[in-house]
From Swiss-Prot:
Pfam families per UniProt: LGT
Species per Swiss-Prot/TrEMBL record: Bacillus cereus (strain ATCC 10987 / NRS 248)
Record's function text: Catalyzes the transfer of the diacylglyceryl group from phosphatidylglycerol to the sulfhydryl group of the N-terminal cysteine of a prolipoprotein, the first step in the formation of mature lipoproteins.
Alphabetical list of NCBIfam families matching this protein: lgt
UniProt: a 1,2-diacyl-sn-glycero-3-phospho-(1'-sn-glycerol) binding residues: 138
InterPro entries from the UniProt entry: Lgt (IPR001640)
Spans through the membrane: 19-39, 56-76, 87-107, 117-137, 178-198, 206-226, 237-257
One function term, GO molecular function aspect: phosphatidylglycerol-prolipoprotein diacylglyceryl transferase activity
EC identifiers of the protein: 2.5.1.145
Protein name, per record: Phosphatidylglycerol--prolipoprotein diacylglyceryl transferase 2
């Protein structure tokens, strides 16, 4: 293998004069669109008005992107304070999922209160869409050659039976790296299937969404330990791992609390439109 012949994939998908469209944005857009279609179809089965998720996305998407970028920039302020012109260059990557999740949850809480709809009902319906979108979105990191792990040998990557297109894209500045984007994407796809199975069971309202938070956080905690570009809370604490542990604990406590207080009595697929549950 002639290492000098390995060239990264072109991050630019389309270019019309000054207009540049990056694969990163296209891939994120595909994830959002598929998630919206999935949530809308499931919502119809549970008597949620057809325009509800479209309206929610129109509010939540820009706020989530903004909060995800702010979250990232704050933890990388040592760099961005000297590169202010790059703060809004999200096509180069650098949006934090946990920041986006915070923005999405806050927006959905406000949205459901104004529409007099159960937050937990919408969150449960959206949970598979969220994790599917995250699984797809990680391939944007692949195109940007970011969110990778530490150095490994080509032999190691070949032992994973990965196609050359992935192995070669993991060749960055003279070294091969762990394709952590792929590990997390696979974990999220398994989580997507798991959530589809769980929602056919006896879980109460809100518990599909909380299960999503737990599942995603478990995978993210371990994958984050392999990454080399983690946002750091301190010199030894990775912010994503702290957030993951926090979300697992909070989600478990919420499940227990809601059941004990009688706040979770409706099963996921019951046609109960009580906005308080």
């Amino acid at each position: 293998m002639n290492l000098l012949s390995i060239q990264p994939l072109n991050r630019i998908a389309i270019q019309f004069g000054p207009l540049t469209v990056y694969w990163y944005g296209i891939i994120i857009g595909i994830g959002i669109l598929l998630g919206l279609i999935l949530a809308t179809r499931e919502g119809k089965k549970l008597q949620v008005p057809s325009n509800t998720f479209t309206d929610l996305v129109l509010y939540a998407l820009p706020i989530s992107i903004l909060s995800a970028r702010i979250y990232y920039v704050l933890f990388e302020w040592a760099y961005y304070k000297n590169h202010l012109n790059e703060i809004f260059a999200i096509w180069n990557g650098g949006i934090a999922i946990h920041g986006g999740l915070i923005g999405a949850i806050v927006t959905t809480i406000v949205f459901t209160k104004k529409r007099n709809i159960s937050f937990w009902k919408l969150a449960d319906i959206a949970a598979p869409s969220l994790i599917l979108g995250q699984a797809i979105g990680r391939w944007g990191n692949f195109m940007n050659q970011e969110a990778h792990g530490g150095p490994v040998s080509r032999t190691f990557l070949e032992s994973l039976r990965l196609p050359d297109i992935i192995i070669n894209q993991m060749y960055i500045n003279g070294s091969y790296y762990h394709p952590t984007f792929l590990y997390e994407s696979i974990w999220n796809i398994i989580g997507f299937v798991t959530l589809l199975i769980l929602r056919k069971g006896s879980l109460k309202r809100g518990e599909i969404f909380l299960s999503y938070l737990i599942w995603y956080s478990i995978g993210r905690f371990f994958v984050e330990g392999l990454r080399t570009d983690s946002l750091m809370l301190t010199s030894s604490l990775r912010m994503a791992q702290v957030m993951s542990i926090s979300l697992i604990i909070i989600s478990l406590l919420l499940m227990i609390y809601r059941r004990r207080k009688g706040l979770a009595t409706t099963r996921y697929n019951e046609l109960n439109n009580n906005a308080l549950e």
